[in-house]
A protein has these predicted regions:
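Sec-dependent N-terminal signal peptides
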Residues: 4-14
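Sec/Tat signal peptide C-region and signal peptidase I cleavage site
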Residues: 16-20
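Transmembrane beta-barrel domains of Gram-negative outer membranes and organellar outer membranes
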Residues: 21-151, 162-166, 174, 179, ...
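Flexible, surface-exposed loop regions and adjacent strand-edge segments
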Residues: 80-83, 157, 199
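Active-site glycine- and acidic-residue-rich loops that bind
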Residues: 159-161, 196-197
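Short helix-loop boundary/capping segments
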Residues: 176, 180, 186-201
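A contiguous pocket-lining binding segment that forms or flanks enzyme active sites
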Residues: 201-210
Length: 226
């Protein structure tokens, strides 16, 4: 009987030790794997300067935004010290209200001065970049419809007053300091001049670079193709 007990102990204890080793190794491997979490605060707001970012207004939050497009800075193009390098010349003013239906879906309305546009918009966050790079970029879809109330003989019917815009917004946060956004855009205008086209494509890009925890440099640029 004693021999049988000794034999059982010899068999069981090494097995238990091996199982404990396997469990410990598995725990260490799981801890070493990067956790899959969404990358937060890629940009601080839903717009950089003139272009949209991947960000949306959070659920049940309201964003009221007044944007100004000033005049030319250079003296040769109408700017100069007499109008404070374009600041006195407001080329466009846009007042918008945006609301977060969910953390990924926002809607909005706006009024723009230049073409006397009334706008409706929607933006949806399709994908969020993850910390483990399983999803390397954030992707959002944006759509806007504008209706001009400008008094013009060119608008012979109301259908001419509509402009439609759709965007696919691609963004990546490369580090805690640098975030980049790239925006291909398609625009359809129901009414255009004789030498213009109804459908146009454009590319926009921009970045945010944080040089202190509370200060950043932001930049964006857009180019019409064709």
């Amino acid at each position: 009987m004693k021999k049988l007990i000794a034999f059982i102990l010899i068999v069981l204890f090494p097995s238990a030790f091996l199982f404990a080793q396997d469990d410990l190794l598995k725990m260490l491997q799981d801890e070493s794997k990067p956790k899959r979490e969404p990358v937060l605060a890629m940009f601080k707001t839903n717009k950089l300067i003139n272009i949209h970012t991947n960000e949306t207004v959070r659920k049940r939050n309201l964003d009221v935004r007044i944007s100004h497009l000033f005049g030319n800075m250079g003296k040769e193009s109408g700017g100069g010290v007499h109008n404070l390098y374009g600041i006195d010349q407001s080329a466009d003013i846009r007042m918008g209200v945006h609301y977060g239906i969910t953390d990924h879906l926002m809607v909005g309305v706006a009024r723009a001065k230049r073409n006397e546009d009334l706008e409706g918009l929607v933006k949806y966050r399709i994908l969020d970049q993850t910390t483990d790079n399983a999803i390397p970029v954030s992707v959002s879809a944006f759509a806007n419809i504008a209706y001009s109330v400008k008094e013009s003989a060119d608008f012979k019917n109301d259908n001419y007053r509509f402009v439609y815009c759709s965007q696919l917004i691609l963004a990546r946060k490369f580090s805690s300091r640098l975030s980049v956004v790239f925006v291909p855009t398609f625009t359809h205008r129901n009414f255009v001049g004789a030498d213009d086209e109804n459908n146009t494509w454009s590319l926009s890009g921009g970045f945010r670079f944080k040089f202190t925890p509370s200060a950043s440099v932001i930049f964006d640029y857009s180019k019409t193709l064709g």
